[in-house]
Each structure stands twice: as structure tokens, then as C-alpha cells.
Amino acid sequence: MSRILIISPMLPGIGGVSVSSNRLFHNLKKDGYDVDAFNIRFKNGKHNKPPYLALRYFTIPFYILFHRRYDIIHCHVPGVLRKLYISLCKPVYKGAKLVFTIHGDAHPLVDNKFVKYALRKADKIICVQVGDSAKMPGKLTEKAVDIPAFILPRVIDNTFTPKSILDFCENDGGSKLLIFNGAAVVNDEWDDLYGFKDMVAAFKALETRGDYRLLMILNGVPKNRQGEELIKEITGQIANDRSVKFVENEPFELCPLFRFADVYVRPTKTDGDSLSIREALAMNCKVVTTNIVNRPQGVFVYESPSQLAGVIENAMESEPPASVEQIDYYQYIKELYTKLLSNA
């Protein structure tokens, strides 16, 4: 049986990449593959600081070198330097096929000459945003393929959902439940990338018109002072609102909660394929999101923050969209592995 190594943030980390990679890992295990996972983050969150993470990442080639030979090394790693480091160390991988998955919008990333160099070393490139593979520069289009990140869990239940969150979602009292999740990303490029302020403003407007509840989830710890100030501002605005539950840095999966939600709101300023949107649709939950990238069939989209509350109301009042089956892309990844190994 083929040996596979997945290099990625993994659960209990928070976010779509860790969720998708974790499901890929466990599905491969259940299907009899000899698969290992290298978590690029620490299970103990207090160690997830730049110096410690850099040191952990530095050890990856040594981990590969001192383990029995892998046939495929599949990397789900963010950033320029991480991809470059993995590629430069390819000679120690004992002939393993190297696969990179690009999560998010690939266009800004591949404008970087170091990323292009790193990707040229890969045997296959997976783009989660449909259409990105055809837009890869030069000969990278020959290596690239579109495979969205959506992989369904084999079992969907609330086993790992904290009781306080489950109680908030279940005890509706006739009110409508909105779910939002995002990271506190504020930098020179993005002011509130995930749209916390847009979500709170829309919810405040909706509260004057009807009975709503909001489960607001913060993914991870803010990475700079601006992010910390954003969360301080947001928590100050919702501090006395009993209709809002703010959850900070708790590792659990969203998928089971979509069974209780009326609308999942994703007001991001940029995006990839968005695992959570496909999960919500698969659980027959309505989705409201920005129109900045190609979205799956069945979502409600808006153009500007001023439209968000109105589009949420429209989604509430609309008939559920025709059921759109969400393809589980796990099988596509297995087929890619098989083709890679057949060409070895």
C-alpha cells in the first residue's frame, strides 16, 4: 500500500484547511492507506508563536528523512517561505511525489517569483478555487488541477461540540439563528478581512426588525495589535447583547451546527472555495456571502456591506434553494494519487 504524508495544520487547529486535511487523513486511514500527518502547528496553542512555529517547520525534512520512504508528500501550507523551503528540500524526499494544495485565491500568490519557483518543483498543484488552474503562469498549467477542498466527514454528530454552544444553537425560542466565523485579520492589505464589523452592523440592523440570534466564532488568536483592537471593538459592541454568543478560539467543527442555523453569513473580502459554505449547503442551511469570487450554486450574494442586512432578510423569507448536491472531492484526490504513482 502506498505511503502518504500530509503536511498541514491539523485539528484541533481551527479553520477550513485543518478541517479538510484532517478529513482527508482519516478517510485515507479508513480506506487502508499507510498515511501519516505532520501538523505544522502545536496542539498546545500557547506554543503557536512565530519562533516556535519556525523551528517546528524547520524539522520537516528531517522528519521525512528519518522515516520510511513516502510515495507522496502532500503539502497544505500557507505563505511563500514555507512553500519555498519544502521545495528546496525535495532532494531528501527519496523520490516521493510532491503535491501542493493552494488554499484561497491563487492569483496573488503566483505573482511571486519565489512561489513560481517552488511550484515548479511540485509534481502536481491542486487549486481549490475552480478556474485557477487554467490561469497558472507558463507551464504550471500542465501541473495544476482544480479540486475544491470540500470533504464530508464520515459521521456528522455533536460529539465534540461544547455544550454551551450546542445549548445556544438548540434553544431557539422561535428566533432565527445566524452563524458567522472568521479570523481577526487586519493588515496593510485588508481592513477586517473576514468582515466582523460588517456582520455586527448587519445584526444590529436586523435586531430592530425581528427576533434573531448570532453565533459569532473567532478563529485563532489575533496576530497583531490591529487584530486585537478589532476584537476589542467587536466584543465591546456585543457585550450586553444576550442574543449574541461570542466564541473565541475553541476547536470544534461547524458542520453539525448548520443543522440548527437559518443562515450562515460569510462576509469575507477575499476567499478561496470556502469549505464552510459547501458544508452549510450540504446541511440545507442558507448562505449569504460576498460576490468577490465564484460561489457554489444556491448561495445568496451581495456587493457592498450596506446590502448585507437586506440580503439576510431576503434569504430568510425565500424558499430554500433547490437542493444542490455538494460533491465530496475526496475521491478526486485519491484518483490524483493513483495517477501520480502510475507515472512513477
Please annotate each region the language model reported.
Residues 168-194, 200-203:
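Conserved donor-binding/catalytic core segment of Leloir-type glycosyltransferases
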Residues 218-220, 228-249:
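Nucleotide-activated donor-binding/catalytic signature segment of Leloir-type glycosyltransferases, i.e.
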Residues 277, 281, 286-289:
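Short hydrophobic beta-strand element within catalytic cores of glycosyltransferases
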Residues 119, 251, 256-261:
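Short alpha-helical donor nucleotide-sugar binding micro-motif in glycosyltransferases
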Residues 160, 303-306, 316-344:
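A charged, aromatic-enriched C-terminal amphipathic alpha-helix characteristic of glycosyltransferases
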Residues 269:
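Aromatic "clamp/platform" in nucleotide-sugar-dependent glycosyltransferases that forms part
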Residues 40-42, 181, 213-230:
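Glycosyltransferase donor-sugar binding loop
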